[in-house]
Amino acid sequence: MSSKNLSTNLLATESNLEKLQIDSLALLRWLRPPQASHGLAEYNTPEEIAFAMGISLEKLRFLATSTSLIKHYLPFKISKKTGGERIISAPKPELKAAQRWILENILEKLEIHNAAHGFCKNRSIVTNAKPHIGANVIVNLDLKNFFQSISYNRVKELFCGLGYSEPTATIFGLICTTAEIAINGQINYTASENRHLPQGSPASPAISNLVCRNLDSRLAAIAENIGFCYTRYADDLTFSASEDVSSKISNLIKNTKFIITSEGFTVNDNKTKIADKSMQQEVTGVIVNTKLNISKKTLKAFRATLYQIEQEGLSGKTWGKSTNLIAAITGFANYVAMIHPNKGAEFKSSVERIKQKYGNSQTDEVRF
């Protein structure tokens, strides 16, 4: 179902009929809470979704069908470490609340692959790095344009695979994706078919992990088959082996690229790295040669970032892959404290001053 047809269907419902249906739905859910597959609550119609979110049908239609004249996102750019800029699309409060509702009521209830360590509870860059400590060789690969590679159709298929109806999967897919186009230097958001996960939505990281379950399963299997360990943190893929497997590295990379391409992603060849134990081995910025450690370069960059934030504010600043800057710097400061207590204490003090000065969150959130 296209966004245009969905909009027409949603508009066709009169307000008085909407009230009647919502009252009926309330009674129905009290008598028989429906279940989709995976133990998830079932939402078969736009009316049921709107009721569950606690918003009107008209509001749901507004959030699901955006055009260049109705912007649901606030775009801003951040600098990449390798040069250039990355567009972050931060959803406005109402859309962000809808995305967070989907995250908390659906996405977080599902299991991801054990190899995935990014954007999930009880896993971090630390748990992602630990399996690779003391490895004989480490191979790092990077997925190019990770979120942009996950299209609306893939997101919709994810929800269909969870047992949701076509109309429901369409609505969830539209709420969780967007299409960015530049007109005269301005970023506009359209209802085109070329939609993808926005980098900035609270639902995007969880969706990416769920979409990547098959990718992770295939890569973990091929890695194990030739004596490698595999983990993934967002778009960073790491393979390591404790034995001398130098003769198998080219075969690993070749087969890995084939799987990645067949799963709809692309390897960024410029970021492929191979490091044996005579070199400094890093996994998502963590040194793992003999124990977990942090490079002086990374510590210096983090100290500079905290200073800039404290002096200039949150706008335009970033740390790591998270779009929640406060959460990112808090997490990294805590991580440093685990390895270097004195430096960590210094960083944590800086973070607390930043929180007192600018607040604990970057944007106000509306929760349904």
Predicted regions and their residues:
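Right-hand nucleic-acid polymerase module
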Residues: 1-78, 85-87, 91-111, 115-137, ...
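Short beta-strand
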Residues: 229-233
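Active-site-proximal polar cores
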Residues: 204
